[in-house]
Amino acid sequence: MKLFAYFLSFLLLISGCSKNDNTNQPLPDTMYFPPLSGNEWETVSVADLSWNQNAVQPLKDFLIQKNTMAFMILVNGRIVMEEYFNGHTPSAGWEWNSAGKTLVATTTGIAQQEGLLSINDKASDFLGTGWTNMSLAKENLITVRNLLTMTSGIDDANQLVIKPNLTYVADAGTRWAYGNVFQKLTDVVSVAGNTDFETYFNEKLKNKTGMDGYWNFGTIFTIYHSTARSMARFGILALNKGKWNNEQIVDEQFFTESINTSQNINPSYGYL
């Protein structure tokens, strides 16, 4: 998976970037938030950080070998490295793939803090009775939280999220399985906010962080597309626990919950 290659590349760079004992340059310890529009973005160099400059080219070679499209490293919001490969450009979009689930979770958290829903609400409060192919008793066990934590108990064998495929395997909360039924959260937010999901997402998250991009609501996958810089913007939001500049865009408690164990079946999983 490409996202794994990006992450592995980042780890390799960090492990290869040693400090120079003869240089004592101060780190840019103040957090920087790029302007919401335009291409202005502060940078800091590898040399300024006293990182290992000799490791940069081997890293680039590795990224090319792994068919990487875009690669960025930020320190406190400032760009240290920004590289594009294999014909990709700064203005070109790319799929977030599974990382887009984090955007869905964050948007759900914003809807909760605005009082539009509680993640403890039944999913059927928003999706209506009969949104699954399960008995009513079993369907009513599924909460918004279950969709966030992959514990709906719905059969994950078929990734096409249509009613005939949403069949019972286990009671909600008793089984963890990675699947596409999380996509129903976009419908939950849409109903709760009385608008379509993308409009709500744009207003509450995308525009407030200066991201670009769009959602592709396909028959199997719901995928966000954007530039690498937009993904970096979301990274800055995450680094600051849901805060952008002086605005708490997503509740810090929800953000903390989302990156910690959310249930006792798969302790490695938070919210999407």
Kindly give the residue locations of the regions a language model identified.
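Bacterial Sec-dependent N-terminal signal peptides
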Residues: 1-26
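N-terminal leader/targeting segments and the immediately adjacent pre-domain N-terminus
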Residues: 17-89, 94, 112-117, 149, ...
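Non-transmembrane alpha-helical segments in soluble domains
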Residues: 60, 109, 124, 145-149, ...
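Active-site SXXK
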Residues: 77, 94-120, 147, 184-189, ...
